[in-house]
């Protein structure tokens, strides 16, 4: 598979050999669509699509049709519903609109009908703005109980687009006595204020839903659009929403369905590949070739996606193995040393990627959006979840998040296997404590080693699990690397089920204050078993939510 994908998207045989060697050394991994579809006729090598729902009968039905094709060719979809008029608003025929949610219900069924490839059903995340009159109901659409069953969308994921005005209102409401936290819900068609609610009440409901179901995802609209390339701002382009895994932040409109192809470097081996000058440039070239393949081969039903890919040629080079690198080098996640290395890593990746896209602009031509003719690719970096790719890469840590356990039982079709943290195993071996009993204790303690007397306090710091780490450090690291990430990051947060509500609020406020662009899942307990998605949407303890496999890479 490595050879097939490398050959399909390389410039020449030498480039293909280098890509194969990099993947064989586990220095990087192709995204699932690139690895699965490269060199075949099965589907497209694109991970993510973002489309915009127009406020018209034609716009909505066109959205359904486009979703069918995008999903069938293997991509996860994020759709923006913020422009669709709300329930009760007049239509062009003089009747009253049923609102956006019943139309989302159709997409909910559509995703069951259209599969990605052979085995996986379609995956879709609907996004709605925090000012939309239906946002209160939208927060609950994934809960199977309460409300009209015909307005529930339990097969979809969902995200809320939040502006600075809302977050500033929440900040003032929690710091100023008697502050009026009135929040206007405005119909996007008529611009009429449909309802006035308490911003704090809406915020509490949003956080409560994240604790109970892991969602909605959050996109901080102003931070995202402030970071849009100047040449796209001059064209009036705007990012309305994110994707299924919250790492893609590309402009969409009536003409553009955003496209992004992904693959990820393995930071666990940063010390090795950072010494190879051609490594990052080779990956940028490969991803640009993936885009070119899509532009040339996508069917006519994907015209909006082809147009967007042609105009901006955005790619998403991501990363995994961040925590594994720290453990390999005995660096605690919660440390200045980890912060320094984090900055060094992503500065290196961005500099090399930027150098290569400028070289490609000279060699192949700049993307049409760039009227200054400086870059081939409008966006270069995006950090995807990487759950599957991290397993392929020797069970390295997924994406930029901490390990959720130092030992867990992984369930596969072949049976159940005990997965151990290899660096912890090496440490225990050096202490003569690499025994079955010790590992059974670790599993019994949900993957934690804090109870082991054989480890020093410093060693326990290095092997803290995700839920044991102060979540502010996840935000700090994400904020520091965001400077180098053109798009966004799949940032997961981890809390115990009995988390203090003030702490939950403060971490989310910190994410906004530190200019993070998006937040992905809120996971309410450290994982003690492998990805085994529960069909139950609401649960007291969330072990694992479903990641979009298309975004793996």
Residue positions per predicted region:
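Secondary-structure capping and boundary motifs in well-ordered enzyme cores
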Residues: 15, 42, 56-60, 95, ...
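Catalytic alpha/beta core of large soluble enzyme barrels
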Residues: 239-251, 291, 295-296, 381-540, ...
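Flexible, glycine/charged-enriched surface loops at secondary-structure junctions
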Residues: 14-19, 76-79, 118-125, 218-220, ...
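Conserved alpha/beta enzyme-core scaffolds, especially Rossmann-like or related mixed alpha/beta domains
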Residues: 1, 43-44, 80, 115-131, ...
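Acidic/polar, glycine-rich intrinsically disordered N-terminal extensions of enzymes
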Residues: 1-47, 51, 178-179, 203-207, ...
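Active-site cavity-forming subdomains of large catalytic enzyme subunits
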Residues: 46-267, 271-272, 301-306, 357, ...
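Long, charged, mostly alpha-helical binding arms that flank functional sites
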Residues: 254-317, 327, 437, 444-468, ...
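Internal maturation/activation junctions in enzymes
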Residues: 20-27, 31, 190, 280-306, ...
């Amino acid at each position: 598979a490595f050879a097939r994908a490398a050959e399909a998207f390389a410039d020449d045989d030498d480039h293909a050999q280098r890509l194969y060697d990099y993947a064989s050394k586990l220095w990087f991994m192709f995204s699932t669509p690139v690895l699965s579809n490269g060199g075949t006729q099965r589907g497209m090598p694109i991970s993510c699509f973002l489309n915009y729902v127009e406020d018209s009968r034609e716009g909505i039905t066109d959205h359904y049709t486009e979703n069918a094709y995008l999903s069938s060719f293997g991509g996860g979809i994020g759709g923006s519903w913020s422009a669709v008029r709300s329930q009760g608003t007049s239509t062009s025929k003089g009747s009253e609109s049923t609102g956006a949610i019943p139309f989302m219900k159709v997409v909910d069924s559509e995703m069951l009908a259209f599969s990605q490839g052979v085995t996986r059903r379609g995956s879709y995340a609907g996004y709605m703005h925090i000012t939309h009159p239906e946002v209160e109901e939208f927060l609950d659409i994934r809960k199977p109980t309460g409300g009209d069953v015909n307005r529930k969308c339990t097969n979809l994921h969902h995200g809320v687009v939040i502006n600075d005005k809302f977050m500033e209102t929440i900040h003032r409401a929690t710091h100023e006595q008697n502050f009026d936290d009135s929040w206007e819900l405005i119909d996007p068609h008529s611009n009429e204020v449909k309802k006035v609610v308490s911003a704090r009440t809406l915020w509490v409901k949003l956080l409560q839903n994240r604790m109970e179901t892991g969602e909605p995802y959050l996109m901080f609209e102003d931070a995202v659009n402030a970071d849009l390339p100047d040449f796209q701002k001059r064209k009036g382009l705007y990012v309305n929403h994110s994707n299924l895994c919250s790492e893609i932040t590309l402009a969409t409109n009536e003409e553009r369905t955003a496209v992004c192809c992904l693959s990820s470097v393995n930071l666990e081996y940063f010390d090795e590949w950072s010494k190879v000058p051609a490594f990052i440039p080779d990956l940028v070239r490969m991803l640009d070739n993936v885009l070119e393949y899509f532009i040339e081969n996508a069917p006519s039903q994907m015209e909006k996606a082809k147009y967007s890919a042609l105009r901006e040629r955005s790619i998403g080079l991501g990363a995994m193995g961040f925590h594994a690198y720290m453990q390999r080098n005995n660096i605690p996640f919660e440390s200045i040393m980890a912060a320094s290395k984090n900055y060094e890593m992503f500065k290196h990746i961005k500099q090399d990627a930027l150098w290569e896209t400028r070289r490609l602009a000279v060699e192949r031509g700049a993307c049409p959006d760039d009227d200054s003719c400086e870059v081939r690719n409008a966006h270069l970096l995006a950090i995807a979840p990487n759950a599957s790719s991290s397993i392929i890469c020797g069970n390295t840590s997924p994406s930029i998040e901490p390990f959720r356990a130092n030992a867990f039982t992984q369930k596969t079709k072949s049976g159940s296997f005990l997965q151990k943290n290899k660096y912890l195993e090496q440490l225990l071996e050096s202490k003569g404590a690499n025994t079955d009993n010790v590992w059974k204790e670790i599993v019994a303690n949900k993957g934690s080693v804090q109870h082991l007397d054989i480890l020093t306090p410093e060693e326990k710091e290095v092997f803290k699990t995700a839920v044991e780490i102060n979540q502010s450090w996840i935000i700090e690291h994400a904020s520091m690397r965001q400077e180098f990430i053109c798009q966004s990051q799949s940032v997961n947060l981890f809390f115990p089920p009995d988390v203090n509500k003030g702490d939950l609020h403060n971490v989310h406020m910190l994410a906004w204050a530190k200019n993070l662009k998006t937040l992905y899942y809120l996971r309410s307990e450290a994982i003690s078993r492998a990805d085994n998605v529960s069909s139950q949407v609401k649960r007291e303890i969330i072990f694992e939510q479903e990641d979009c496999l298309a975004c793996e890479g």
